[in-house]
Regions:
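Histidine- and acidic-residue-rich, metal-dependent catalytic cores
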Residues: 2-459
Length: 459
């Protein structure tokens, strides 16, 4: 596996953290725009508030990222509490378990799946009243206090139309806010400057500019990029597996076609993103256990248009075209534009073969994985019919076992262990006590978490 590992090691990051975040927000907006705009308003206000507080111990970009994703639990179907992620009348602030469980999911998703790490613990007790004592022992309580205040203000502005904030912001949720941060917010919002930005929708561009300045280390950026695959799980687990496997096959085929590191990086990024538009495809279609009707197939095929919309302006144009064309065929029988082979680039041809190889060799909602012989037979026929490039498909036909072995090797590297997220969330769902502050205090250590050890006994 040394050669495929070398190819993997040669890849360079194409998308910046800012671009990844923008793309991810468009994905979430494809599920529920109201929740996404609530997050945007919250993040904008949290950014401005944090700057006003001027506490060097606060990580502004992490607070903004937490704010943007703090409602992730609302984007997935919840069969236990009968929640549909497409609902328009959302309750964000109840202390009932049907609500608090969503923030617990967000907490552990962001802890294990993003660079936020322990900062995400700010969401664990998100809907509980502000605790002044906890603020002195756990920095996450500060993050929570900032984001919660801004989320409540976001909700108030949304539900009260043209009204401005009450003179005393504490009236929105008596006993739930940090008075220090309320004072800081009033300073930041002097003459209603922040509220006016939100009412005029000018805050989005301003926040977007800040998001573009966010930086992370390469390994942390890779974690963020994987969100673009794993957010698909809010609609279909099969689609997540397929996106990873198609990326593995693309890398194997690209390496055999002699692509240089720059070309391999473009191909791999295209493969990671190739089905991103399925986030906007109805779940009933993605998970349908049989052959789709012509009408539903038309809806399914529209995912390439959704991909183009989601990636537009946030991704190099060539990668967008690779994604948009991954269902085109050399003989013009593909979709959406029936582009012929003379107009399809080498990378687009490779991505098509990788996508088909994964589709045939994976289990899907409507089929089990095909046998090696059946997979080869289908690819052979598609090649003979002029749909696939024989210079590429020959590697699948002649070196199938090795390519599959490479896929399995790469999959273990590229996939993320989601079990910890599910374990913590399940533990919360199926216990009566829920998450107690004690669990956080047990993990407090050093000067980062405890400002005054002598006060700990007073809690």
């Amino acid at each position: 596996m040394s050669q495929i590992q070398e190819s993997l090691d040669s890849l360079t990051q194409i998308l910046t953290p800012g671009q990844i975040i923008h793309i991810s927000l468009r994905m979430l907006g494809s599920i529920n725009k109201n929740i996404t705009f609530h997050n945007l308003r919250t993040a904008y206000l949290a950014w401005k508030l944090t700057e006003t507080i001027n506490d060097s111990r606060l990580n502004t970009q992490n607070i903004v990222l937490l704010s943007l994703y703090h409602t992730l639990g609302y984007f997935r179907e919840d069969t236990i509490f009968g929640y549909n992620p497409h609902d328009s009348n959302i309750d964000f602030f109840s202390e009932e378990k049907r609500i608090t469980s969503k923030y617990v999911f967000s907490c552990y998703y962001l802890k294990y799946m993003t660079p936020l790490g322990d900062d995400a613990r700010a969401l664990e007790n998100f809907t509980q009243p502000f605790n002044e004592d906890m603020k002195h022992f756990l920095y996450q309580e500060k993050y929570k206090a900032i984001i919660y205040l801004c989320a409540r203000i976001s909700g108030y502005l949304y539900h009260h139309g043209d009204e401005y904030l009450p003179e005393d912001i504490n009236e929105i949720a008596p006993g739930y806010f940090d008075t220090e941060y309320v004072r800081a917010f009033n300073i930041a919002n002097r003459n209603n400057v922040l509220v006016e930005q939100i009412k005029d929708d000018k805050y989005v561009d301003e926040l977007s500019g800040y998001i573009n300045t966010i930086t992370y280390e390469p390994e942390e950026s890779e974690m963020l990029e994987k969100l673009l695959i794993y957010f698909l799980d809010f609609k279909s687990t099969y689609t997540v597996t397929h996106a990873i496997n198609a990326s593995c096959y693309a890398l194997s085929l690209g390496q055999r076609m002699g692509l240089n590191p720059k070309e391999l990086s473009e191909l791999f990024c295209s493969a990671v993103l190739h089905d991103i538009g399925k986030i906007a495809t109805p779940q009933r279609i993605l998970e349908f256990p049989g052959k789709l009707s012509p009408e539903d197939m038309g809806i399914m095929r529209h995912h390439v248009n959704h991909s183009k919309r989601i990636l537009s302006g946030q991704c190099p144009e060539q990668i967008i075209e690779n994604v948009y064309r991954h269902h085109e065929k050399l003989n013009g029988t593909g979709y959406p534009k029936h582009v012929t082979g003379d107009k399809l680039t080498l990378l687009q041809r490779i991505l098509t073969v990788a996508d088909i190889t994964s589709a045939l060799n994976d289990s899907r909602s409507y089929k089990s994985e095909f046998s090696t012989d059946k997979t080869k037979a289908i690819i052979t026929k598609m090649t003979e019919d002029g749909e696939l490039d024989p210079a590429i498909s020959k590697f699948v036909l002649e070196d199938f076992d090795t390519i599959v072995a490479e896929q399995q090797y790469l999959y273990k590297i590229l996939c993320v262990d989601f079990s910890q997220v599910l374990e913590h969330h399940s533990n919360y769902l199926f216990t009566d006590s829920g998450i107690m502050a004690d669990s956080l205090l047990d993990e407090a250590n050093g000067e980062e978490d405890i400002e005054d050890l002598e006060d700990l006994e007073e809690l």
